[in-house]
UniProtKB/Swiss-Prot annotation:
Similarity section: Belongs to the binding-protein-dependent transport system permease family.
Listed InterPro entries: MetI-like (IPR000515), MetI-like_sf (IPR035906), Mo/W_ABC_Transporter_Permease (IPR053405)
Keywords: Cell membrane, Membrane, Molybdenum, Transmembrane, Transmembrane helix, Transport
Gene coding for it: wtpB
Membrane topology qualifier: Multi-pass membrane protein
Protein name: Molybdate/tungstate transport system permease protein WtpB
Extracellular side of membrane: 27-48, 115-116, 199-223
Organism placement in taxonomy: Archaea, Methanobacteriati, Methanobacteriota, Methanomada group, Methanococci
Example GO BP: transmembrane transport
């Protein structure tokens, strides 16, 4: 190898180890895993995974038509719309909580929604949806962009309606993008802490419980639950990589 290649490889190894070593150390020193059988921990996992599933389903329902429109149509202010849809990825997490709370209580006609959002399961779903929708929309939009419009055109010239072409031709061709969007949106949602602290501390999600255990009892008390979340994250991104390879074939 040339010196340049060696230098580049050193940077790769350093950044890889920067991420890999702490994770491996954590997994090899998980603390008392019996904590994962604690009723409060089990309930937190149930709440987190269920809220993540509901938010991801809603994101999917809205993400498919949104991604299709962004991929297939040009319209005024399209760039602005795309920028707004991407904003949740750039806004600090705690600020997202303030934004949602301010909107709910700042507009009189929707004040009543507060009782269903603040310290409520649906508040968790709302936050998860807010932070996860950009990943769903972007993945699906990229999928539609990768489908040759000529295929859809041929389908319609052969007598298929636009809606039939959409469901029988376009959607099946982007199934891996849809799955990737689901995984990314779900993973982003269940990892949220800052906005949840402000909107819905209760019922407790896993990240909130980890934060609470750490603040109350220290590092050792938070490690086993953290390991549980790490394993879920690894499983999700293993699936993502698998479907990514399938999409590239």
């Amino acid at each position: 190898m040339e010196k340049f290649d060696i230098a580049m490889t050193v940077f790769l190894v350093m950044i890889f180890l920067f991420i890999f070593l702490p994770i491996i150390y954590m997994l090899s020193n998980p603390g008392d895993l019996n904590q994962l059988l604690d009723k409060e921990v089990i309930e937190a996992f149930k709440t987190t995974l269920l809220a993540g599933a509901v938010a991801t389903l809603i994101a999917l329902i809205f993400g498919i038509p949104t991604g299709y429109i962004l991929a297939r149509y040009d319209f005024k202010f399209k760039s602005f719309v795309e920028a707004v849809l991407d904003l949740p990825m750039a806004i600090p997490h705690s600020v997202i909580g303030i934004i949602i709370l301010s909107f709910i209580y700042g507009i009189d006609i929707i004040n009543f929604i507060g009782r269903y959002v603040v310290d409520n399961f649906w508040g968790i779903v709302t936050v998860y949806l807010f932070v996860g929708i950009p990943f769903m929309v972007n993945s699906i939009r990229d999928g539609f962009l990768s489908v040759d419009e000529e295929i859809e055109y041929v389908s319609r010239t052969l007598g298929a309606s636009k809606i039939r072409t959409f469901f029988e031709i376009s959607l099946p061709l982007i199934k891996n993008n849809i799955i990737s969007g689901i995984i990314l949106s779900f993973a982003r949602g269940i990892s949220e802490v800052g906005a949840i602290l402000i909107i819905a501390y209760y019922p407790k999600t896993v990240p909130i419980l980890i934060y609470e255990r750490f603040m109350s009892f220290g590092l050792d008390a938070s490690k086993p639950i953290s390991v549980g979340m790490i394993l879920i994250s690894i499983a999700l991104f293993a699936l993502l990589r698998m479907f990514g390879r399938m999409r590239g074939r």
